Amino acid sequence: MTDSQNFESHTPMMQQYLKLKAEHPEILLFYRMGDFYELFFDDAKKASRLLDISLTKRGQSAGQPIPMAGVPHHAVENYLAKLVQLGESVAICEQIGDPATSKGPVERKVIRIVTPGTVTDEALLEERQDNLLAAIWQDKNGAFGYATLDITSGRFRVTEMPDSESMAAELQRTHPAELLYPETFESMALIERQQGLRRRPIWEFECETAKQQLNLQFGTRDLTGFGVENARLALCAAGCLLQYVKDTQRTGLPHIRSITMERPQDTIILDAATRRNLELTQNLAGGCDNTLASVLDLCVTPMGSRMLKRWIHTPLRQREQLIKRQDAISALQPLYFELQPFLRQVGDLERVLARLALRSARPRDLSRMRHAFQQYQDIHQVLDQADMPYIKELQQRISQFDELRELLENAIVETPPVLVRDGGVIASGYNAELDEWRALADGASDYLEKLEVREREKWGIDTLKVGFNGVHGYYIQVSRGQSNLVPMHYVRRQTLKNAERYIIPELKEYEDKVLTSKGKALAIEKMLYEELFEKLLPHLTALQTSAEALAETDVLANLAERAESLNYTRPELTEKTGIQITGGRHPVVEQVLSEPFISNPLQLAPQRRLLIITGPNMGGKSTYMRQAALITLLAYIGSFVPAEKAVIGPIDRIFTRVGASDDLASGRSTFMVEMTETANILHNATENSLVLMDEIGRGTSTYDGLSLAWACAENLANRIKAMTLFATHYFELTTLPEKLEGTANIHLDAVEHGETIAFMHSVQEGAASKSYGLAVAALAGVPKEVIRRAKQKLKELETLSGHSGASHVETSQLMLLADIEPSEVELALNKIDPDSLTPKQALELLYHLKELNK
């Protein structure tokens, strides 16, 4: 900020501002001035652009006009929410001195820093989504350490990733609101599209310092008990993250009590492409509609909703834990209708407790906590009906907190105001001294009514009335027409258009007494409110345990309701390799369709591990494949599944190579994206992986594409032996079952009726007889003359190739076109390697070809 030059030439107020701004150079500074938060210089210009607020000037300082923008203090949360959504951080600077006693500028201090990853105010958060702060570290060998913290719950997780591909998947899974990275970070391409990037000095990632910080936070001598002692890369990231939180929160963090190491071998691994293609919590357009979560998540608490989404993104491999969840869902099926109304009243206890820990809880947070405690007895009574060990385990974690409930019932009014400074938070009868001061203040209304009647009758002024405002205090108001009747001892305080306002010694004396009593009452309220924190915080650990158990109860009750309402069945998790599904349905598509969904079977086993899927476009191949993956994933979060019966063996990873588009930002063509995803599968799949391969090789020439598809299928069947669904339009691949053990053909059925086609969406054994491409083109609205011409060419090609239905290679096409002299454009096209072109080169070439064709 160039305006900080010639510091002494600035006004005292601007000098104070510049000192505070120098301490927070990279973030916006909201500087409190009266009823506004003001921004100056570059901050003002940036805020004006981002918030669409007026940019003005505040006189001059150091000979230059000062750019200025401001927001009203009562609306600041709305503006903070917008800035946080845009990935910005803000330092909040408040007046802490008394203007009446200050010489020079009122003393000010930055009291909190709001960043996208550390917000706790409910107005700034999406209530049904986790809001994570993350830190990333990379060593010289290319391995990564990664840490995440949800400050609204205290959930602190670390992991280590061997390469960029797995790190990319983890970034997509966690989707952090803010990401800290070292200034020397080399893999910027991995994170450059992340919002809320914060570059940090290299020394903040020092491992030994991290261990000291973490031991200090947890009150431990070492980290062995957390299982992270030797995870050096993860600790580097965790240390930076914890230091950042301490710097921004400027208070204790008692709700961050432990750190957990997440190991890839404990969960089913889903790479970034799979998470995207399966549309788990976000659809391909970036929204939330028509996703698995949109169907599965009817949780009645926000904390339950967030937990369910974590389950969806982290399917477990521990069969025992999954069976516990299944048992709990079965036990809750007859009880969820009775249980959910009580759970709904618990609300977002998890985030309320985080604000309590950070001492930022507002009166309504304590009211919500009280209301949650009042539901506990009813929740326990319902759960008592479920005679099932895992439910009993959850009940034990949900302590009743009767003493805390009684404390809050006695201390907090039924409907408290938003802020403590508004007064009226502490209930009457809780503190005798507070009641006395309130009685004095509240007696004002009776006194004022009597004064008004007395003065009106005494002086014969029927328009006389007594009032109060925040600027002038108490006053006696008389209409302009009767102002000549007021006695001499009335002192004029304010003149209005149609009235005069006066003060008398008696009223002034009473005003001082009332304002003193109100001030005393408010001071006592604030003290009592702080004392409530001291009484609640010793129970924080038990409260957090209880909130987590309630969230899990909500998730399980929700899954019980979904199973009942959507006709899901309990899957059998077996130790034998394979997937056997009878009457399987796509959980999302069946909810979108207006007509009944056609259910289909799936059999995968060691002796039937690769299925070649053929059939028409729009026949349902992609839906069938995704359906298999989603049913498997649901089984491995412990949910019931959309099927008549499902028996599912061990799964270590789910891969999808389904659909593709150009990645222009990275300079990758559709075919390059397709091959990159295919390479990832061939390198990392195992015999326990579920692999979905859709239309491999379609982005290149027929020979190249067919060869690649054939080789990939062989590799998956012979070397990897993964459970694979392989959809293709290359009919040559339907001969693979004759050559490869463990391979079979299935197809999606369709029936032609004259010029039209009916898609049966039914899976049948064997290969499809035709691709029905022209019928689909006609349905899509391709002009009839084009369809007629296409049919003619199809007959010619089929005559030359000697068969119909199979894909036709370039030789037959060249035979048809051999008598045609190639044009300049064709000659130029033959020299082009499309996969080596950048988007810019392709555009330039297009203009060149257009010129040749003139």
Swiss-Prot record:
Q: Which PROSITE patterns match?
A: DNA_MISMATCH_REPAIR_2
Keywords from the named record: ATP-binding, DNA damage, DNA repair, DNA-binding, Nucleotide-binding
| The keyword Metal-binding is assigned to this record | no
| Stated family | Belongs to the DNA mismatch repair MutS family.
InterPro entries attached to this UniProt entry = DNA_mismatch_repair_MutS (IPR005748), DNA_mismatch_repair_MutS-lik_N (IPR007695), DNA_mismatch_repair_MutS/MSH (IPR017261), DNA_mismatch_repair_MutS_C (IPR000432), DNA_mismatch_repair_MutS_clamp (IPR007861), DNA_mismatch_repair_MutS_core (IPR007696), DNA_mismatch_repair_MutS_N (IPR016151), DNA_mismatch_repair_MutS_sf (IPR036187)
Q: Which GO terms describe its biological process?
A: mismatch repair
Q: Give the matching Gene3D superfamilies.
A: 1.10.1420.10, 6.10.140.430, DNA repair protein MutS, domain I, MutS, connector domain, P-loop containing nucleotide triphosphate hydrolases
Task: Give the signal sequence positions.
Answer: none
Its recorded name reads DNA mismatch repair protein MutS
The gene name reads mutS
Q: What is this protein's function per UniProt?
A: This protein is involved in the repair of mismatches in DNA. It is possible that it carries out the mismatch recognition step. This protein has a weak ATPase activity.
Q: Which NCBIfam families match?
A: mutS1 (TIGR01070), PRK05399.1 (NF003810)
What HAMAP family does this protein map onto?
A: MutS
The keyword DNA repair belongs to this UniProt entry's keyword annotation: yes
Q: Which GO terms describe its molecular function?
A: ATP binding; ATP-dependent DNA damage sensor activity; damaged DNA binding; mismatched DNA binding
Q: Which GO terms describe its cellular component?
A: cytosol
